[in-house]
Amino acid sequence: MKVAVGSTNPAKVEAVREVFLGIYGDVEVVPIEVDSGVPDQPVGLEETVKGAINRAKQAIEKTDADFGVGIEAGLYRVPETITGYMDVQFCAVVDREGRITLGHGPGFEYPPGVIRRVFEEGVEVGIAMGELVNDPELKRKIGAIGVLTHGMLVRKELNKLAVLMALVPRLNPEWYGL
């Protein structure tokens, strides 16, 4: 089985590799640089989902893969939170028939100073967090979640949960009409 990932970010590519390998066994994962078609910092569920779907579709279109996978993180409004926003990773999986399945991982809040920079300066959360901890490659490694959880959950693991959730209908095709 061949799986194309609409990203070259190791935290995304390895998450896809590990989940697909665990479910399907032998799998070839091909990272493909694509344009998400949404702002670098998506805001709102619609924008975030659109980014994940665009990544998945472009990945499969540019290859002969069986599946295209897109992962997009974005902020969305949540009442009663400290900042008013939470971050969530959405995953889209598209197959050769064009069927799309979606999933997302756990949501979490960024520090208020990071959210302020996003909305006042237009800075992407990954960049703002990288600057906060003096690591410009943070989003390609443990991610903000790795810093915020003191290493208890890293970005790859967060992405793996989103990928697994997007595969739930494919693991149970008879219940989802696939």
Curated annotation (Swiss-Prot):
Names of the cofactor(s): Mg(2+); Mn(2+)
Keywords: Hydrolase, Magnesium, Manganese, Metal-binding, Nucleotide metabolism, Nucleotide-binding
BP-aspect Gene Ontology terms: nucleotide metabolic process; thiamine metabolic process
GO molecular function annotation: ITPase activity; metal ion binding; nucleotide binding; ribonucleoside triphosphate phosphatase activity
Database matches in InterPro entries: ITPase-like_fam (IPR029001), Non_canon_purine_NTPase (IPR002786), NTPase/PRRC1 (IPR026533), YjjX_NTPase (IPR050299)
Disulfide bonding pattern of the chain: none
Binding residues annotated for substrate, in chain numbering: S7, T8, N9, P10, A11, K12, D64, A65
Annotated catalysed reactions: XTP + H2O = XDP + phosphate + H(+); ITP + H2O = IDP + phosphate + H(+)
Note on cofactor: Binds 1 divalent metal cation per subunit; can use either Mg(2+) or Mn(2+).
EC number(s) per entry: 3.6.1.73
Family to which the UniProt record says this protein belongs: Belongs to the YjjX NTPase family.
Quaternary state and interactors: Homodimer.
Name listed for the protein in its UniProt record: Probable inosine/xanthosine triphosphatase
